[in-house]
Amino acid sequence: EEGKLRKSFRTSVLKGLKNGVSPESPDCLNFTRNYQPTVDAAYLAQAFLRAPKALWEPLDTLTKQRYVTAFKSLRRNKPVYNNHLLFAAIIETFLLKVGEQVDQAKVFLACKKIEEWYVGDGWYSDGPSFSMDYYNDYVIHPMLVDIYQVLKEKKIVSERQYNTAVKRMIRHSD
């Protein structure tokens, strides 16, 4: 029973992903109006990074190219100077992972600023001033670790940098 549900869900998700970038579909996602698409695309790119065999690889070539084009179109958006730097960076990291041209400045700026904003004990400030909020939990730690994992695989950052991010995330979760 559970296997049948899983198969049904996977089929629905893949259909939804295809519809998300099909111009003729009423489910086509917004990648052009205001800044919100960058936030939404960041979580989609992170899902593709975390589950490539389930979410990215099964997509047909046209759908993949449409996502790449949509993600690249978001480069026009300037991120807010806080955890939003990671949204642009994770999109670029996904593009790196799939062999596309990358705006390295977005990735390096995000990593540099987040590292500068580390305040200790597993906490990062969300921009230049510290605020104790939930962004450490579901943006900063998971995205930074996922970015560093790909950069480590590509030999762009050291194992030490990746391990430090993982240790800080573990400390934050304690």
State what each model feature region is.
Residues 6-169, 174:
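Aromatic-lined, polymer-binding surfaces characteristic
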